[in-house]
Amino acid sequence: MSVITTPIETLHLKSTLRLLPRAVYRSQRIQVFPPNIFSNTSLSSPLRIDPISQVGGSRNLWRRYASDNFSEMGLDPGADPFKVIEKPSIVDRMKKANSILPHVVLASTILALIYPPSFTWFTSRYFVPALGFLMFAVGINSNEKDFLEAFKRPKAILLGYVGQYLVKPVLGFIFGLAAVSLFQLPTPIGAGIMLVSCVSGAQLSNYATFLTDPALAPLSIVMTSLSTATAVLVTPMLSLLLIGKKLPVDVKGMISSILQVVIAPIAAGLLLNKLFPKVSNAIRPFLPILSVLDTACCVGAPLALNINSVMSPFGATILLLVTMFHLSAFLAGYFLTGSVFRNAPDAKAMQRTLSYETGMQSSLLALALATKFFQDPLVGIPPAISTVVMSLMGFTLVLIWSKEKSNTF
């Protein structure tokens, strides 16, 4: 059906269409319209506007055709044509900095191997404050509700805890013993592998879970937080049990150090979030990019500082043992969860989450403890290698499982 409009209506329509984009621009918003929408439609309904005559002049009459076909107008039929979106700001982009973390880990590893001086300035004295900053970021992005999530799925929390502080230490003891007995490596190397197995879960496991199964990210945070909070007692005790007969372990010193590096920063972040929400909201957008840079230094520096040991004849053997330890931990967490939650509706997602929790350790904490409480620098080599291996293996699984999920759906 066609309608003949008057010249006055034509002028009004043309002026309206000409002024509308300016009003949109001035409000700093972008309409979700294709570029040619203003020349093809009126404001009230999907209409096609064609001039009757191709002779120039403002007295041309225009025909308006009412149409129900949005596709020929260049619009998505299921979309809201008047939806408004904001232009992403620098702060918004900074909030998403964590999305490049896997690439940053790989890049810092390669850079540390190719040009070690790029990270050697980040000496061992910076490890403790760097790890403390990451813990502070965890605290400021959490609240008491995150910890209360533990009571909703106690069975999963218990299984994650068993994986962290029973399955993993047993694997660490086996591979640490094999390093000394079978591969004839120095005793401090075996002690370093055992130390890695005694620390709490890595915060990167929370992000890995978020990338593959966002719905279980809160559960992952609770499991990691509980293992981190209790590490103040469990890690020194396990270290004494597994390493004490081989090397002296300062239990009191470890407890004090974990309190300062882990518990205090998390508590500070929680308190700041609770008591001064405006301050925490102001600094929260900057934490992802700072955390990524912090993690890059924490991954590259241990590798660069121990480059001679890593590239030594027994460096490949240590790399093999650490890789096998993490691979065994990933597999143990995956299949143990599958046997316990085989009938759960989200069994596969639970398997992936518990696999991350068991396979990814806070190797930075192990490195900080090795640097501070063991005189032999060889103890720090397995944690340094573990930092890189654990990160690369974890995010490789993220890529594999994400692709698997997309193919399933």
Curated annotation (Swiss-Prot):
State the compartments where it is located: Membrane; Plastid, Chloroplast envelope
Interval spanned by the transit peptide: 1-49
Q: Per the record's keyword annotation, is Repeat included, yes or no?
A: no
- Which InterPro entries did the record assign? BilAc:Na_symport/Acr3, Bilac:Na_transpt, Na+/solute_symporter_sf
Is Lyase one of the keywords? no
Gene3D superfamilies in the cross-refs: 1.20.1530.20
Q: Name one GO cellular component term.
A: membrane
Record-annotated membrane-spanning stretches: 100-120, 121-141, 170-190, 191-211, 221-241, 253-273, 285-305, 316-336, 381-401
Please provide, alphabetically and separated by semicolons, the GO molecular function terms listed in this UniProt record: glycolate transmembrane transporter activity
Pfam (any one): SBF
Q: How does it sit in the membrane?
A: Multi-pass membrane protein
What UniProt keywords are attached to this protein's entry?
Chloroplast, Membrane, Plastid, Transit peptide, Transmembrane, Transmembrane helix, Transport
Please give the function described in this protein's UniProt entry. May function as sodium-coupled metabolite transporter across the chloroplast envelope.
Return the similarity comment.
Belongs to the bile acid:sodium symporter (BASS) (TC 2.A.28) family.
Q: What is this protein called?
A: Probable sodium/metabolite cotransporter BASS6, chloroplastic
Q: What is the lineage of its organism?
A: Eukaryota, Viridiplantae, Streptophyta, Embryophyta, Tracheophyta
| Name of the encoding gene | BASS6
